[in-house]
């Protein structure tokens, strides 16, 4: 089935008319009412050849009450089907089966006498080689809704508004062949030749071939009256002839042919044509040669061409009229095209004339132009309506032209003024506009240029501002370059001073422990130091500090290197090691060449401090071991059975303790004697205190005793079990006056310790209680010991964070805790009531009537408890 010619390619909207009707611009004129006695057109009888208006596959274009169909080709009439069938069969249909006809609207169609089908498109068997190439071209022409032609490629599915070059070449080839055929036909009309057999048509490409819209759409400019008259005459004649003929289909078909043959024909001059197409073309050429107008009637045309021999080219009158109608349609198109071209040429001439005339400007009025150019033929030949359109276009063109000229003049003036300002050396970035105007008036180039003097003041001021800004940018760039040069010189000065510090470090004058005051005499005499003075940024002192800090930052890494060197050499820093020996050992290693002298000294100080700390810790450990041995010796004396008495000599009891381990730990005999005498002194002080406190304030102690027993936590026990013996009670504590000197606590503590020694030594029960009661005083003395340790702290960087020092401090703290445990273990042995009352009053409230045996029993019980805790 042939595709509808009005279908656009993909991507464009189809130009479908509203409500299924053809477009208004393509609607054929309505048929006037039929005259009386004329019947409406009817279908021809079966079996007869179709008349002109009833070709199979076509709707009569002039049937009353109906409109011209947009697509008069059915599926059976598709040329692609014929082409495909012929291609499959292998043999194309002969040329004689196809005949060319002209529809009433002037369009050419083709009729197949074999299958009684009509098509709009020219069959492939009738096409020339150029036409076949044109049909195979992928580019096809279509029309949009507005009537503007566009071109579509079936293969690449591309649409464009411009005409492809391939399509132009093929159409030029087709026109060339058609022109050659026309010349051949003219020669044949003048010199008739015998008919020659037509060659077989070229092969037809498979597939449907789209028909361009221009071949199927009627000419919109054609007059309605001419179409009606041309279509009505053959219709009326055909219908009248059918009515008068016999009822049989054969008679109705043959009667018009006999009548046409019976009409008188002019004498033939003996000219002959090879086929009907050439004869029809010769008849049209006759009408064209005689200049038959498109509005001429048949009778007028006959008068003009009847005497020509070519008039007899078509034997039948119907064929002549059909060719005449086709010629009129074609001639009408040509006349309209010629008129359109003449009007277009006249408009172009007028437009060119107005655009080039010197009196025309963009502000000229139409009335003024009509008064000026009204007498000229170029003005009068164009209609007024089109003339106004041309005039508006000219005004638009002139306005655009004047605007462009103004822009060019403005650019020219600005460029000229810039050139003048650039050449004036008196203008700098501080020049004002009034000064610049005076300089310009004195400049000969500006004074001689009239266009430059008529320049817009605002444009001149803008140009001057841009010039001044350019000068300011140049000045700023020059200043920036000067600043960069100055900064570069300052940087070079700093680098030179840095290299000077490197030289001092290489010579050993500068190290991590150097100070600015030490090096200033050597630094100030150098020229590199003098170049640094007065410039911003880092000062020589800052660079010196940065350099020293950098050397100090290398301390930890260099310290590791020094330790590795000492480890490889097997050298250890002791308390009595000299720095010269330390430096002498390090100097033998190659790695010491890159070490800083100050860091070497700091490392030696750090190692020396660690050695001193180790020695101090060793001494403390030895003292702690000695104290533990003395405590064990005193405990051995306390636990002696029978107990030691006052007045006992060391030689008498020495043999009793020879086999004891505590005796063996004290290696010096003098120490043993000293500890034994201290023990006897403590024992003696305890006995004396017991004798002096028996008869002191008995009544008042009783009241306090009853009060204390009522508040005692262990109320079920007796007073005798809760309170310690009177001999173990400490003396009354005297309230200290704040105005007294700070040395009194230490003196009181010494007196207590001496008193404890008088009471029988540290091994006696009273001495332990005194130690327990004075626990708070001992705690107050511990911070003083810590302050003494802090005196040995060094200012070296690793003195605070050295892990060996931390380990030493931790071990010292652990030993202090171990030394504090025996003292704290004595506190729970005291009764709660005794401790609380002692803290509140400081007086002993036990009974004085206890016997000496009871006191001895309690003393032994306390000693036993102390031994158990130890």
From Swiss-Prot:
Coiled coil: 604-640
Annotated region (Disordered), positions in chain: 146-277, 690-870
Gene3D superfamilies recorded: 2.20.70.10, FF domain
Cross-link (Glycyl lysine isopeptide (Lys-Gly) (interchain with G-Cter in SUMO2)): 175, 837
Compositional bias annotation for Basic residues: 691-711, 778-794
GO biological processes: mRNA cis splicing, via spliceosome
Ranges of Basic and acidic residues composition bias in the record: 804-824
Keyword flag Disulfide bond: no
Pro residues bias locations: 192-211
PROSITE patterns, A to Z: FF, WW_DOMAIN_1, WW_DOMAIN_2
Pfam families reported for this sequence: FF (PF01846), FF_PRPF40A (PF25432), WW (PF00397)
Matching CDD domains: WW
Predominant cellular place of this UniProt entry's protein: nucleus
GO cellular component: nuclear speck
Residue list for modification N6-acetyllysine: 148
The entry's keywords: Acetylation, Coiled coil, Isopeptide bond, mRNA processing, mRNA splicing, Nucleus, Phosphoprotein, Repeat, Ubl conjugation
Subcellular location field: Nucleus speckle
SUPFAM superfamilies: FF domain, WW domain
WW domain ranges (all copies): 92-125, 133-166
Bias-annotated ranges (Low complexity): 182-191, 739-756, 764-774
UniProt subunit comment: Interacts with the N-terminus of HD.
Record's function text: May be involved in pre-mRNA splicing.
Name of the protein in question: Pre-mRNA-processing factor 40 homolog B
Annotated organism of origin: Mus musculus (Mouse)
């Amino acid at each position: 089935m042939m595709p509808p010619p009005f279908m656009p390619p993909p991507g464009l909207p189809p130009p479908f008319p509203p409500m299924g009707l053809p477009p208004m611009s393509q609607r054929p004129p309505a048929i006037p009412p039929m005259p009386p006695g004329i019947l409406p057109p009817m279908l021809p009888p079966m079996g007869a050849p179709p008349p002109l208006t009833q070709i199979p596959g076509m709707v009569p274009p002039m049937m009353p009450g109906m409109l011209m169909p947009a697509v008069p080709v059915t599926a059976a009439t598709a040329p692609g089907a014929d082409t495909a069938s012929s291609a499959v069969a292998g043999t194309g249909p002969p040329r004689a089966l196809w005949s060319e006809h002209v529809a009433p609207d002037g369009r050419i169609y083709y009729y197949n006498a074999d299958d009684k089908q009509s098509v709009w498109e020219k069959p492939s068997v009738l096409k020339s080689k150029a036409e076949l190439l044109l049909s195979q071209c992928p580019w096809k022409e279509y029309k949009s809704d507005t009537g503007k032609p566009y071109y579509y490629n079936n293969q690449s599915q591309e649409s464009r508004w411009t005409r492809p070059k391939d399509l132009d070449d093929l159409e030029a080839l087709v026109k060339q062949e058609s022109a050659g055929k026309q010349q051949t036909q003219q020669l044949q009309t003048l010199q008739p030749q015998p008919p020659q057999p037509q060659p077989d048509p070229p092969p037809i490409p498979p597939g449907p071939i789209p028909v361009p819209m221009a071949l199927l759409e009627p000419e919109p400019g054609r007059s309605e009256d001419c179409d009606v008259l041309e279509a009505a005459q053959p219709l009326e004649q055909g219908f009248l002839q059918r009515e008068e003929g016999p009822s049989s289909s054969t008679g109705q078909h043959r009667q018009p042919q006999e009548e046409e043959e019976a009409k008188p024909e002019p004498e033939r001059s003996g000219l002959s044509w090879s086929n009907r197409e050439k004869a029809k073309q010769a008849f049209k050429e006759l009408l064209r040669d005689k200049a038959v107008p498109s509005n001429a009637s048949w009778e007028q045309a006959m008068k003009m061409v009847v005497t020509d021999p070519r008039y007899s080219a078509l034997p039948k009158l119907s064929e002549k009229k059909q060719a005449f109608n086709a010629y009129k349609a074609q001639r009408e198109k040509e006349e309209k095209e010629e008129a359109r071209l003449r009007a277009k040429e006249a408009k172009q001439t007028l437009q060119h004339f107005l655009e080039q005339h010197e009196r025309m400007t963009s502000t000229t009025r139409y009335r003024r132009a009509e008064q000026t150019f009204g007498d000229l033929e170029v003005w009068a030949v164009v209609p007024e309506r089109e003339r106004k359109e041309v005039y508006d276009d000219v005004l638009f063109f002139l306005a655009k032209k004047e605007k462009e000229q103004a822009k060019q003049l403005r650019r020219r003036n600005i460029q000229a003024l810039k050139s003048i300002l650039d050449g004036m050396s008196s203008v700098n970035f501080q020049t004002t506009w009034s000064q610049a105007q005076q300089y310009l008036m004195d400049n000969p180039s500006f004074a001689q240029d009239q266009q430059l003097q008529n320049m817009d003041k605002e444009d001149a001021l803008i140009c001057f501002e841009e010039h001044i800004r350019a000068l300011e940018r140049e000045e700023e760039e020059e200043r920036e370059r000067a600043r960069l040069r100055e900064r570069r010189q300052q940087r070079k000065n700093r680098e030179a001073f840095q290299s000077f510090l490197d030289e001092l470090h290489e010579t050993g004058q500068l190290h991590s422990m150097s100070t600015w005051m030490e090096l200033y005499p050597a630094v100030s005499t150098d020229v590199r130091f003098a170049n640094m003075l007065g410039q911003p940024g880092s000062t020589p002192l800052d660079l010196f500090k940065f350099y020293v800090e950098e050397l100090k930052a290398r301390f930890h890494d260099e310290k590791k290197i020094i330790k590795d060197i000492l480890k490889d050499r097997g050298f250890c820093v002791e308390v009595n090691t000299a720095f010269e020996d330390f430096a002498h050992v390090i100097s033998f290693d190659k790695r010491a060449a890159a070490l800083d002298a100050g860091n070497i000294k700091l490392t030696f100080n750090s190692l020396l401090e660690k050695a001193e700390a180790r020695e101090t810790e060793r001494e403390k450990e030895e003292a702690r071991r000695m104290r533990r041995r003395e405590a064990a010796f005193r405990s051995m004396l306390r636990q002696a059975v029978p107990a030691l008495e006052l007045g006992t000599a060391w030689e008498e009891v020495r043999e009793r303790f020879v086999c004891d381990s505590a005796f063996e730990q004290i290696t010096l005999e003098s120490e043993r004697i000293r500890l034994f005498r201290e023990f006897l002194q403590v024992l003696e002080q305890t006995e004396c205190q017991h004798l002096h406190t028996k008869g002191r304030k008995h009544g008042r102690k009783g009241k306090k005793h009853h009060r204390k027993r009522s508040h005692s936590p262990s109320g079920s026990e007796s007073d005798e079990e809760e309170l310690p013996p009177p001999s173990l009670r400490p003396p009354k504590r005297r309230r200290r006056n704040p105005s007294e000197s700070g040395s009194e606590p230490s003196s009181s503590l010494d007196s207590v310790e001496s008193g404890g020694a008088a009471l029988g030594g540290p091994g006696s029960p009273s001495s332990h209680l005194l130690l327990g009661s004075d626990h708070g005083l001992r705690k107050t003395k511990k911070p003083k010991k810590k302050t003494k340790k802090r005196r040995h702290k060094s200012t070296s960087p690793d003195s605070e964070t050295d892990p060996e020092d931390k380990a030493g401090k931790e071990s010292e703290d652990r030993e202090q805790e171990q030394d504090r445990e025996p003292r704290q273990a004595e506190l729970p042995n005291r009764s709660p009531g005794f401790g609380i009352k002692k803290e509140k009053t400081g007086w002993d409230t036990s009974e004085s009537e206890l016997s000496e045996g009871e006191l001895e029993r309690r003393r032994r019980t306390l000693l036993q408890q102390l031994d158990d805790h130890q």
